[in-house]
Amino acid sequence: MRKPVGAIEIVLAPGEVVFETRPARLRTLLGSCVAITFWHPQQHIGGMCHFMLPHRPHKHKALDGRYGDEALEMLIRHALANHTKPRDYQVKLFGGGQMFPEQQNDSQQLNVADLNVHAALAMAERHRLQLKAQDMGRTGHRTIIFDLWDGNVWVKHQPIEVTEKDAR
């Protein structure tokens, strides 16, 4: 579907959560961060978050979109505020790319990208969300473009090539 006349374009920075009820194109650039898209196929409303870490070490009263659990809670609250049920949204997950694959981690310790991927999947399951697609993990960054008028998400993945020299 073509971009509707008057559709707005919003670029999300890390830690931002956006929910729109008007035609909009949402964009973000992800490395080890994860984006969650929410789209209601009947209402053509939804949003996206760009979280940096799975959760905050210490709880705080105000929600903060930098943390996955809180960013998802913000999206759920927006859905409820628009008289819709979170389980009626199509949910897609993106990101969690290794940005420094040449740095070998201790096998007992997960890195931020892996923690974000595991957290996103666990949160989707815990909230019984309708997970329609995912493109997470591997190396490199992703450009995400999410069109609210039709629910399409476009992903451009730029992997990082690791040479033998880098792996040392």
Curated annotation (Swiss-Prot):
<dbReference type="InterPro" id="IPR038592">
    <property type="entry name" value="CheD-like_sf"/>
</dbReference>
<dbReference type="GO" id="GO:0006935">
    <property type="term" value="P:chemotaxis"/>
</dbReference>
<keyword id="KW-0145">Chemotaxis</keyword>
<protein>
    <recommendedName>
        <fullName>Probable chemoreceptor glutamine deamidase CheD</fullName>
        <ecNumber>3.5.1.44</ecNumber>
    </recommendedName>
</protein>
<dbReference type="InterPro" id="IPR005659">
    <property type="entry name" value="Chemorcpt_Glu_NH3ase_CheD"/>
</dbReference>
<comment type="function">
    <text>Probably deamidates glutamine residues to glutamate on methyl-accepting chemotaxis receptors (MCPs), playing an important role in chemotaxis.</text>
</comment>
<keyword id="KW-0378">Hydrolase</keyword>
<dbReference type="InterPro" id="IPR011324">
    <property type="entry name" value="Cytotoxic_necrot_fac-like_cat"/>
</dbReference>
<comment type="similarity">
    <text>Belongs to the CheD family.</text>
</comment>
<dbReference type="Pfam" id="PF03975">
    <property type="entry name" value="CheD"/>
</dbReference>
<dbReference type="GO" id="GO:0050568">
    <property type="term" value="F:protein-glutamine glutaminase activity"/>
</dbReference>
